């Protein structure tokens, strides 16, 4: 599957090529770290988020809803976006400036839990048992001082854990924060989040949905597999973009990005352990059987 004349590791990204000198177990551990792979759909979403972040303050700030199936890669995109815009410290005022605050919607959402989760995210000491008005006042005071440009709320489909009245209250809270702080709010969740927001005409118009869909067989997916292969410290090229391997990967994972990453990482581990040093169809099939 590889050209024997190729220089060992020539198919790898430069930093990954250096890992080939490590013992097998160290290479396997290195593969288990989180990795970021640029691909067109993710880049498009990151560009959309960047445009939101750059929007000048106005009365009605633009917002959006990023949705897709569980493990499709939504959270990884948000983490990449947050990493690209780290906080700074205002030495003169002694205040941390965070352009982006990213949090998770509590599993059982209500105002008290939401404010407590937000305060926890920004590192603000507080009593979770305090009254809603106290938590709200503390949150508003701190956020006005920090001047964030964007609030990201992941797992927003947890809204559906509440009854209709509680869902409306949580949605009104999100609109209130966007208006009060004049910042964009980005909601992230599964398709259930779309259902929840569609029950409120104002929310559905305020938060236009953008979907991160499953992968299908395409040139873009082959480019993704090629980019992923460059980050796996195997001594030989696996040529993952070959049609038979592409179809095996899609059949085993359903086109879910997180499942694809897990499949390829485990297959690469098998390739290291059996000394073949390249992912073959047999490795993919073996991992698929173990995880079925």
Report the location of each language-model feature:
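Mid-core helix/loop region of P-loop NTP-binding domains shared across ATPases and GTPases
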Residues: 7, 14-23, 46, 110-114, ...
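A short hydrophobic beta-strand->loop->alpha-helix junction that borders the nucleotide-binding pocket
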Residues: 96-109
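Walker A/P-loop nucleotide-binding motif
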Residues: 58-80
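The feature captures the helix immediately C-terminal to the Walker
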Residues: 79-83, 261
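A short, basic N-terminal segment
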Residues: 1-62, 280, 285-292
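Post-Walker A helix-loop "phosphate-sensing" segment adjacent to the P-loop in P-loop NTPases
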Residues: 83-94, 124-125
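The catalytic "switch" region of P-loop NTPases
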Residues: 160, 172-244
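C-terminal alpha-helical "lid" subdomain
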Residues: 1-19, 71, 218-219, 226-292
